[in-house]
Structure formats: structure tokens, C-alpha cells
């Protein structure tokens, strides 16, 4: 039925969207907040690949850091851009 809804262009109700978001949050919470983020090195490599398409950068100029404080997680990405030539 959802495939038919997709073809007909029916929009999801706000209840369905909220349910999907809650499921994502619960899955994240259940996966273990204390576990080390093993996806950060791959994320950094992919960021280097994407940014390198547009700007010539050194891979060491991109830093990815995950910080946890109580119930809040902050993903910080620092990108040092090359100086623009005059």
C-alpha cells in the first residue's frame, strides 16, 4: 500500500513522520551511548572526498569530533580552508 501511496504522491501524515523520528531516536538510544563512535574515521574520509571535488585541501585539515554531555551529543566538524589567492 505504501508503494501505491508513493506513486500517487500522497504525503505522509505528521503522525507517521513523528513515529519514524521516534523510532530513529530510540534505535540510537538503544545502540549504546557509551560505545565509541566507530563511524568517525569513515565520515572524515568521506568528507575529504566530497570537499576535494570542489576545493584542493589537505586531508589533515579536516577534524571530526564527537562530544557527549548528559543527554546531548555534538558532532563538530572543523575544516581549514586554503587561503584564497589574490
From Swiss-Prot:
Identify the InterPro entries for this entry.
Answer: MinE, MinE_sf
Top-level lineage group: Bacteria
Classification via Gene3D superfamilies: Cell division topological specificity factor MinE
Q: Which GO terms describe its biological process?
A: cell division; regulation of division septum assembly
Annotated coiled-coil positions are: none
**Keywords assigned:** Cell cycle, Cell division
SUPFAM superfamilies the UniProt entry points to: Cell division protein MinE topological specificity domain
Instruction: Extract the signal peptide range.
Output: none
| Matching Pfam families | MinE
Per the entry, what this protein does is: Prevents the cell division inhibition by proteins MinC and MinD at internal division sites while permitting inhibition at polar sites. This ensures cell division at the proper site by restricting the formation of a division septum at the midpoint of the long axis of the cell.
Which family does the entry's similarity section mention? Answer: Belongs to the MinE family.
Name of the molecule in the record: Cell division topological specificity factor
Q: Which organism is it from?
A: Bordetella petrii (strain ATCC BAA-461 / DSM 12804 / CCUG 43448)
Amino acid at each position: 500500500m505504501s508503494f501505491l501511496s508513493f506513486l500517487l504522491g500522497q504525503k505522509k501524515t505528521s503522525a507517521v513522520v513523528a513515529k519514524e523520528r521516534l523510532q530513529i531516536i530510540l534505535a540510537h538510544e538503544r545502540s549504546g551511548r557509551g560505545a565509541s563512535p566507530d563511524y568517525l574515521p569513515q565520515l572524515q574520509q568521506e568528507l575529504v572526498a566530497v570537499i576535494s571535488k570542489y576545493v584542493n585541501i589537505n586531508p589533515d585539515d579536516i577534524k571530526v569530533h564527537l562530544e557527549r554531555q548528559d543527554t546531548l551529543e555534538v558532532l563538530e566538524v572543523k575544516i581549514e580552508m586554503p587561503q584564497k589567492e589574490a
